Amino acid sequence: MKAVRINERLTIAGQPMIADFPSLSAQGFKSIINARPDGEEPGQPGNTQEKSAAGAAGMDYGFIPVSGPTITEADIRAFQQKMAEAEGPVFAHCKGGTRALTLYVLGEALDGRIQRSDIEDFGKTHGFDLCAATRWLERQSAAVPHIKAFFDPRTWSVQYVVSDPATGGCAIIDPVYDFDEKSGATGTMNADAILDYVKRHGLSVEWILDTHPHADHFSAADYLKQKTGAKTAIGAKVTGVQKLWQEKYNWSDFKTDGSQWDQLFEAGDRFSIGSLEARVLFSPGHTLASVTYVVGNAAFVHDTLFMPDSGTARADFPGGSAKQLWASIQDILALPDDTRLFTGHDYQPGGRAPKWESTVGEQTRSNPHLAGMTEEDFVRLREARDRTLPMPKLILHALQVNIRGGRLPEPEANGKHYLKFPLDVLEGSTW
């Protein structure tokens, strides 16, 4: 095992064996970062064994699996976070060390602590070829639009600020309004973090976009509209969702015309974010109103495709359809192979760090719900999987807010807001 000390906080290495972990702890390492996907070669210990061995040796452990071409800023920031959390020296590895060092160096470059022109020499000094790191930075600087993700670990949701570097115009996609179902408390921590980012970067919010009425969190669209004055928008088929849930909530006087938003997008509609053109794909299946927003070389695919190691979204909500979901996914996969895809949720399989960015090509090659699958195969798999899933714990809480455009129910005489729960209207009980 080749191990190279980069500085007093970080050592980069090739694959250690499980028997090495007690020795690493004895040498003073406090944390292990495994940057290697499972199954790369026979005999590789893998995430589960490494996590167990690290814990037994008294070390923290982080799993940030990457291959060179698929490194994203989420991986880089996750590496930095594990470094910051470590209570002492960190031992980071992949198969040979290059990917682990690449994650470190890219973080240093993004934060201005190393110049792009110095990266390859830095690598040579330590015995590594970091040409791929400089190429990554070149691609990243050329990518339009600029995208900043905000991950909410309470709901596994990913929110986005999508900005035009030429004008500073931006859109906010799928923002979360905080809600604690145990206490009934609401908050704006997620939305305020987005507003802080917008302010620090001198951006102007032009749109607040929801991809569909969410069943697992409240939308912060109305709160952000009040703070920014930006227009709110969603797919036009939201009126069908409103009618469906109007009946379930027994709201005879509820408006089901979509007037809670400033704009209802039809399939194929185009709009501007700064000087960038955005267009709308109709993407039903998860819900009957879901849409995808395509901006430059990026598509915001919400609850259709998850990361390639996580498959696809469920299609068993009222108005959902596995067959429609397959068709919607095929429309997304018809985009160019290098189109960046940004998902709406990440459930961190294997305990890995959260991720949200892939490409059309990666999904086609690596997603087990898609690679080598026919429509019939997919529908069979998706429906069988959905039969095992309980309803989301917030579905009855969230939809009565989200079909109102993110507005809480009107306060009652005492000034308090109240949610309404219909009983026995959904299948999927957990007993």
From Swiss-Prot:
Q: Which of this chain's residues are annotated to bind Zn(2+)?
A: H212, H214, H286
Q: Which cofactor does it need?
A: Zn(2+)
> What are the EC numbers?
3.-.-.-
Explain the induction of this protein: Repressed by BigR.
InterPro entries for this protein? BLH_phosphatase-like, MBL-like_hydrolase, Metallo-B-lactamas, Mito_Persulfide_Diox, POD-like_MBL-fold, Prot-tyrosine_phosphatase-like, RibonucZ/Hydroxyglut_hydro
| Record-level GO BP terms | glutathione metabolic process; hydrogen sulfide metabolic process
For this UniProt record, give its keywords in alphabetical order, as a comma-separated list.
Hydrolase, Metal-binding, Zinc
User: Which GO molecular function terms does the record list?
Assistant: hydrolase activity; metal ion binding; sulfur dioxygenase activity
Superkingdom of this protein's organism: Bacteria
Which residues make up the binding site for substrate? D309
Q: Which residues form a coiled coil?
A: none
The UniProt record's further free-text remark is: Part of an operon that comprises at least itself and bigR.
Its function, per the record, reads: Could play a role in cell adherence or biofilm development.
Q: Which PANTHER family match?
A: PERSULFIDE DIOXYGENASE ETHE1 (PTHR43084), PERSULFIDE DIOXYGENASE ETHE1, MITOCHONDRIAL (PTHR43084:SF1)
Q: Which family does it belong to?
A: Belongs to the metallo-beta-lactamase superfamily.
Q: What is this protein called?
A: Beta-lactamase hydrolase-like protein
